[in-house]
Design a protein with these regions (language model features):
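Glycine-aliphatic tripeptides that mark coil-to-beta-strand junctions in extracellular
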Residues: 97-105, 109
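Primarily the internal scaffold of c-type cytochrome electron-transfer domains
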Residues: 133-134, 254-267, 294-319, 350-695, ...
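Extracellular acidic, Ser/Thr/Pro-rich low-complexity tracts
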Residues: 175-184, 233, 597, 813-815, ...
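C-terminal tail/sorting-segment detector
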Residues: 833, 837, 841, 847, ...
Length: 882
């Protein structure tokens, strides 16, 4: 009798569990949502005919899981920040997650002013089609609050400026108004017209109805200005009022040239009309950091100068001088150094004074991953890009000059098609190419236009927008991206495994291959392990500023990440050039130094002022006493000697005689970059694939120097003292010279930032140069100047290179003795000894058939060959490519 009774009890318990299942089995976040807003239970936020008890309040998939809509994502971020589920729900209720003009609280709870509420706080007409496991037509009436009984717009009155006022550009003035409505005023926006009301641009958005606002008057002088105040009531009705008559914005006094913001207006996303970027330290870090510092996006990005672009005191001190020289020119700088602050209108003060701590996170995650290619290619770019491009008044002609476009919606884009993210995501070919990099790494000054002569640039009409926004019709400030486009890296790719990371073939072709090299790891804490994860280190050439950022912005940096980033910079610099010494001595000591550019752009490249590379040559006599030095650097004073033999690689922009006469300046090389209109010299080493014609086309010609087409190296000859018997050569790189830091200190008449930078520079060690490569050589002389030249020790470059299946190695031996030529793989392991025997002085060659000591064919890759003879040793690289 007991067994049936026991079975009946199980059935009863199971039935009770089933009856209780809907409430108990709910997602805990959904439970918290309904605890906060019980009126939402049974509404469309929990039930629609095609999906009862759904999770569509937070997820695009109404069955739950997968990508969250903007409201669900905001809650997830709050939970990841340590809040309970209920605390997280309540913490975002005053936000407008879907950016439709209504707070989450209004959408979920305000059933008085609207006829269709509750509405979905994370869905809009722009993203609702992403929803799944639901009939979308059932959602369309519940995206934005509407249908209220209040259809009367607010009463709005502009009090001031209302006509006749005169305000100075870059001053702060009070805008005042009244706005009232029976449903209350939800928000107030301000707009300015400089055409007597014919067209308006936003100057402030989302203000509370305080009746006044401290308005920073942009540097857009004119006499036809009017202000519009737009108020939205709690029922979604809009009312507005404008100034009754024009008011004046007076020109800004000062500046070497009378530029205004109009001179630096460019197409693309505009302030207060684009994206509101997320704070990466509150959002991105929750999934993309804290699990693998070696490769995770967060830690590696935190160590890059991209993350600190707006914290860089060197940049900030430079921008002060630019603003002194050409008022409003800081706008061009802020575009790419704080794209978040720029888009949100905190660039109206072009000195950067309005920038916040969040803005100082520089070139941050949300900026890059919401970028839209301005040049739409059907079948390549996401179709979601089209309406974004269509909404812009002026499309950028190309990817350059900070003319970026950001998706106004919080939709991330990236290079992988198989991402399972908690946020909205689009596979983007743009994010797999170098085109994105060109946006901020081809910089031109739009205050200048191309003149009639070669390499001639003339000022445009001041206080007017550039006529065509074509970077080729402006003065070139930086051409790193364009230099890459004309290199062999961009055309065919180059076998360069030292840069290639995990790329199995070792071929490097894009900017990303070197500056975001492939590594193995996860892009997010729960993501798959990828062998082609782009490392977000974004390493460049600035190795000293990471040491001083914390001094200027305490508490805003990660010291470990910056130290890691600095080391990556040094490592990259030491891969960027190859140094070769050739003994050219006959009767007197002499030396040839060959520097080969291994990068995909000029070496050095990037921002030109104060950046340089040089060859330091030291010669010693038989007793190893120093008897000669060229391009000597004093590490105690940071002075570099400019002796007659000194080879210093740099670009020297400056002021032409033509412009100097016009502006009353001294002609010649100058650090006043925003006033520069000519290049006085440029002897930087071109990349592989260089031709003079192509580099002229991209406005990066060789100036006052000479490189032949196809040349990506430079050779410098040194006549040494008669007593010289050996030499030591070091190739140095310095990202900031003493002269430039002193310039920033001495020319600053605005504040003491230049002095602060100088003091920090001294404390740091004065940006001591990095040794990119070092080599030494013994010099072999004939007995007398008239003797027949002796053979010299020399190891030639193998031919062909790359090779398959065999290659020839030539070498010279200065005196009789043992000679050894050996092959090593990239890990330094001996592959084969080609020669190991006594030889007389003379010229020789050996051939390698691409086989190891056992006669087995070796695999493709990088190999080293080494020559050892009496008093001489040299090693070179070669590539076997099958």
């Amino acid at each position: 009798m007991r067994r049936p009774s026991w079975s009946l009890s199980l059935v009863s318990i199971s039935l009770l569990l089933l009856l209780a299942l809907p409430a108990a089995a709910r997602n805990p976040i959904k439970n918290a949502f309904l605890d906060a807003y019980p009126n939402a239970d049974g509404s469309v936020l929990t039930d629609v005919p095609s999906s009862s008890s759904h999770c569509g309040a937070c997820h695009f998939d109404f069955d739950g899981g997968g990508a969250r809509n903007p409201y669900g994502l905001a809650i997830e971020i709050a939970i990841n920040g340590g809040m309970s589920n209920l605390e997280a729900v309540l913490s975002v209720e005053n936000e407008d997650s879907d950016n439709d003009g209504f707070s989450n609280l209004v959408e979920v709870t305000d059933t008085v002013n609207f006829g269709n509420t509750p509405t979905f706080p994370g869905l809009t007409s722009g993203n609702v089609n992403t929803s799944s496991n639901v009939i979308i037509a059932e959602l369309l009436d519940y995206l934005t609050p509407s249908g209220g009984s209040d259809t009367t717009p607010p009463d709005v009155l502009v009090i001031g400026p209302n006509g006749g006022e005169s305000y100075g550009a870059t001053t702060t003035q009070t805008v005042s108004w009244t706005a009232s409505d029976a449903s209350g005023i939800a928000s107030v926006d301000l707009y300015l017209s400089d055409e007597s009301g014919e067209g308006y641009k936003p100057v402030a958005k989302g203000l509370t109805n305080t009746g006044s606002f401290d308005w920073f008057v942009q540097n857009r002088p004119g006499v036809n200005n009017r202000l519009k105040v737009v108020a939205r009531d709690g029922a979604g009705n809009y009312g507005d009022d404008t100034s009754d008559a024009d008011f004046i914005i007076d020109p800004l006094a000062g500046g070497v040239v009378p530029t205004t913001l109009r001179d630096f207006d460019l197409p693309g996303t505009q302030p207060l009309e684009g994206a509101i970027l997320e704070d990466p330290s509150a959002t991105c870090i929750t999934c993309h950091g804290g699990y693998d510092e070696a490769v995770e996006p967060w830690h590696t990005w935190q160590g890059s100068m991209m993350a600190h672009a707006q914290r860089d005191p060197h940049f900030l001190a430079t921008m002060v001088i630019a603003e002194q020289d050409a008022p409003a020119s800081g706008d061009l700088c802020l575009r790419c150094h704080t794209p978040g602050g720029w888009q949100e209108g905190r660039s109206f003060d072009t000195s950067g004074a309005m920038v916040t701590a969040v803005d100082r996170q520089g070139v941050q995650c949300d900026f890059c991953h919401r970028m839209v290619d301005p040049v739409y290619v059907e079948g390549v770019n996401p179709v979601e890009d089209l309406p974004i491009l269509d909404d812009l008044d002026d499309l950028p002609p190309t990817q350059a000059n900070g003319m970026f476009i950001n998706d106004p919606a919080p939709v991330k884009r990236g290079p992988y098609p198989d991402v399972d993210a908690s946020h909205q995501f689009l596979d983007s070919a743009f994010h797999r190419t170098s085109l994105l990099c060109g946006t901020c790494h081809d910089v031109s000054n739009p205050a200048f236009e191309l003149g009639s002569g070669p390499n001639e640039y003339v000022p445009g009409n001041f206080d007017e927008e550039h006529p065509d926004a074509d970077l080729r019709n402006m003065f070139p400030v930086e051409r790193t991206y364009s230099e890459w486009t004309q290199s062999e890296y961009a055309s065919t790719g180059v076998y360069a495994p030292q840069f290639a990371g995990n790329k199995p073939d070792g071929i490097v072709s894009s900017c990303l291959d070197c500056h975001m090299r492939d590594v193995s790891g996860r892009g997010a804490d729960s993501g798959p392990v990828r062998a082609d994860l782009g490392m977000h280190d974004l390493t460049g050439g600035n190795y000293w500023v990471p040491d001083i950022i914390e001094t200027f912005f305490p508490g805003e940096t990660d010291a470990v990440a910056l130290a890691d980033g600095k080391q990556r910079v040094i490592d990259l610099l030491q891969l960027s050039a190859t140094l070769e010494l050739i003994d050219t001595s006959g009767g007197t000591p002499s030396l040839q130094v060959k520097v080969t550019n291994e990068t995909g752009h000029k070496l050095p490249s990037g921002y030109p002022e104060g950046r340089r590379m040089w060859i330091n040559v030291k010669a010693y006599d038989e007793g190893m006493a120093l008897i000669y030095e060229s391009a000597a650097y004093d590490f105690g004073s940071a002075d570099l000697s400019h002796d007659a033999d000194a080879k210093i690689y740099e670009i020297e922009p400056g002021t032409s005689y033509r412009l100097a006469d016009l502006l009353g300046l001294e002609p010649g090389p100058s650090f006043h970059f925003v006033l520069n209109d000519t290049i006085w010299s440029d002897n930087r080493i071109p990349p592989r694939g260089f031709t003079n014609a192509n580099f002229q086309t991209i406005q990066s010609p060789v100036v006052n120097y000479s490189y032949a087409d196809g040349q990506y190296w430079d050779e410098t000859d040194y006549a040494l003292p008669a007593a010289a018997r050996s030499a030591e050569v070091t190739l140095y790189y310095q990202s900031t010279s003493k002269e430039y830091v002193e310039f920033l200190r001495d020319e600053n008449t605005t504040n003491d930032l230049g002095l602060q930078l100088y003091d920090a520079w001294v404390t740091q060690g004065m940006a001591a140069p990095v040794a990119m490569a070092t080599s030494s050589i013994d010099l072999n002389l004939t007995d007398a100047p008239g003797d027949t030249p002796a053979y010299r020790n020399h190891l030639g470059q193998n031919l062909p290179n790359p090779f398959n299946p065999s290659t020839k190695i030539s070498f010279s031996q200065a005196e009789a003795g043992w000679a050894r030529v050996a092959i090593y793989d990239s890990a330094g392991r001996l592959v084969k000894v080609l020669l190991d025997q006594h030889r007389n002085a003379g010229d020789y060659e050996v051939r390698w058939m691409g086989r190891d000591a056992s006669g087995v064919k070796v695999s493709s890759g990088l190999y080293f060959y080494q020559l050892e003879t009496p008093g001489y040793s040299a090693t070179k690289k070669m590539v076997l490519l099958k």
